[in-house]
Amino acid sequence: MANMNNILLNMGISLLVLATSAGAQGEQWLQYHSEREAYRIIGGRSSNLTVTTDKPQDIKLPEFKTKQQFFAEWSTPMVNSGKVGIILDRTSEQGNWDRLFIDSNGNGHLDDEDAVEAYQTTEYYTYFGPVKVVFEVEDGPVTYHLNFRFYDRDDQYRRLMIYQGGWYEGEITVAGQKKNCMLVDYNVNGTFNDKSLQSNESDRIRIGKKGSEDTCFVGNYIEIEDVLYQLEVARDGAFIKLTKAEDVKFGNIKLPEAITEFSAGGENGLFTREMENGIASLPVGKYRIDHWEIDRKDDKGKNWTMRGYGFSEKGDFEIEEQAETALEIGEPVTAGLEARLNGENYEFSKSVRGSLGEYVSLTSGGSDVRNLWKMKARSKDGTFEKIYPIPDQ
């Protein structure tokens, strides 16, 4: 009888372990990578830092080779002060700004730092990277990399651009299947778990085939092969956790029936829906429209896609439990023409906008439509008349 009880107990433990592992897969660790031109691999975006000749106060500085320097600060929550000091110096008084100092250990001073030499210089640009920074966190030191591009044409156009220099990537298991996972610090602030209503402030995650560009916002949830998971991302990007989402509250969104695809994002993550009769469901929360699409065929059977994107706060909406939120988006769209006098010549540009001020593009067969838009110019006395193609901006 005791043996039978042991067998039943072991079976119960085994079933419990299986049930637990099916719902929550634990920490799945990723590997850190750095690259000089990381944007070619991970996409991402740059951030512009203001530079000044004013020396910061109460900061120990390194020895310089010239009389003037430029100073900047990079904001990151990974150091106690919330900012990392950066200095640009140059080898000679008339040369490029080819030396960069950064507070790589986050101690608030730069007198203990060595200069990073530029790997490329042009007439106006200087390139650095990947530049290593080490954050001290509870579990020990964490390595992070940045790439820099300094533009120095004149006082009006001078700026320091900062790019991602590293990312996390590796193989994870989702519902028993191996998939590639990539984490990107999209807003370049040193952390990998940022969630936001504004897409530019949300970090990015890819789960699927290696090399896939199907990118989602880091958020509370992520959909993988039509299954909704709760997502947890380590602040430093070292691991993720996926748990099958349960007891999630949903509401509906109502769109014009012409909309064939709709996407919206926020702290819940990014959700893309193939629309049916203008109705789709989303988890309860606040969102901003990411894009909409309308697909049509012309009388010759050619496929066309109109896409609205680049929404401001006018594209914000909220989904409430068991309620329906209606959005008037899509058609009609408005085409505008702008004229600007440049010297003795006029320059013309077009813009196509949706009802919420979003940009609108038109593609056919997946390719941008070139020379679709045309402008007719005619002199007041009628002696001159010509049709000009207007390229997409």
What are these regions (language model features)?
Residues N10-A19:
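Bacterial N-terminal signal peptides
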Residues M1-I7:
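N-terminal secretory signal peptides that target proteins for export/translocation
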Residues Q25-N268, E274-D381, K386-Q393:
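Calcium-binding acidic motifs and repeat modules
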Residues N5, L16-V17, F101, E169:
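Exposed boundary/loop context
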Residues T20-A24:
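Sec/Tat signal peptide C-region and signal peptidase I cleavage site
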